[in-house]
Amino acid sequence: MSCCGGKCGCGAGCKCGSGCNGCGNYADITEQSSASETLVMGVVGTQKLNYGQAEAGVATEGSCSGCKCVYCTCDPCTCK
């Protein structure tokens, strides 16, 4: 479940804030887009993490209660 129904607020330093009036993390039903996205996947690095370390990293890196704001700009606010 995402925070605030899929809305993250941009906080200090363009990190995910705790407000419910931020950008939509997921596309709204009424939102339409004609642009396409390209997802590039690959293997990066050789550092090994155990399960506990990986979960801790996910919880602290630009997230608020399940919303990830990896690509976030504050003006205008774009949490993706």
UniProtKB/Swiss-Prot annotation:
Protein's UniProt keywords contain Hydrolase: no
Highest taxon, organism lineage: Eukaryota
Single GO molecular function: metal ion binding
A Pfam family: Metallothio_2
UniProt cross-references to InterPro entries, sorted A to Z: Metalthion_15p
Keyword vocabulary terms for this entry: Metal-binding, Metal-thiolate cluster
Protein purpose: Metallothioneins have a high content of cysteine residues that bind various heavy metals.
Family in the record: Belongs to the metallothionein superfamily. Type 15 family.
PANTHER family: METALLOTHIONEIN-LIKE PROTEIN 2A (PTHR33543), METALLOTHIONEIN-LIKE PROTEIN 2B (PTHR33543:SF33)
Annotated protein name in UniProt: Metallothionein-like protein type 2 MET1
